[in-house]
Structure formats: C-alpha cells, structure tokens
Amino acid sequence: NVLPSAQYWDHWTIETFAYTAWTHRPLGVMVLDLAYRTGVPWNESHFDNAKFNSLMDTADATLDVAKRKLVLKQVEELMQEEGPIVQPVWRAVFTGVNKRVKGFKMHPTNYFFCEEWSV
C-alpha cells in the first residue's frame, strides 16, 4: 500500500513495515537517540533495550571522539544482534567538480556550502 507523503507521516510509526531515510544529523548519536531509545516518539521499530539506552547515555556524555567510537561500536554490535532494523540500501553519493573550483569538500550531510568555494 503506497500512501502520499502527507498521509504516510500520520501513520509511519504504527505501520507493519515502513521505510525511513534518516539523514541530515551532524552526529551519529543523534539518529540513534531519536529513533531507537525506549519510548521516544520516533522509535518506529519499537526497539526497547535497557543496555542500548545505557550505552547511549554513555556515548552522549563522552566528548572524546575516539572514546565515543568505542562505545558506539558496542551500540552497533548490539543493534546487529538484536535486529531492530534492516538496512535495505546504501545510498550512493556522487559529486563532480571542475579542477578550477577551489576549496570544495563534500560535507557529510550532502549540503553544499557555496560560500567556501572559489573559481
């Protein structure tokens, strides 16, 4: 059953199967906090895991990037074991830039910050 966007978003957390693209969050922990913590409104998978919540508390409180990566490794292993989601696709991102364009770097959110470029 395919619904128009306006109707889909009224039901997306209660459907048996839904496809959601989680994008445009500066930190990986943000998506996990929004989508998989017990009881949060956008937890469409209804994932409920005390160890996950505890690890996320630790990750959120860890400012050192290298240390946070170690905690998030445990989070990802737990999610792979528990299976709250299925990763159906990996989005390919391609960018073409002329060599005359200086200062261009692909941003992780796929936004283009044109004020940083020059020709």
Q: What residue ranges belong to the model's regions?
A:
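Detector for C-terminal structural segments
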Residues: 8-119
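Short beta-strand-to-loop elements that line the ligand-binding cleft
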Residues: 1-4
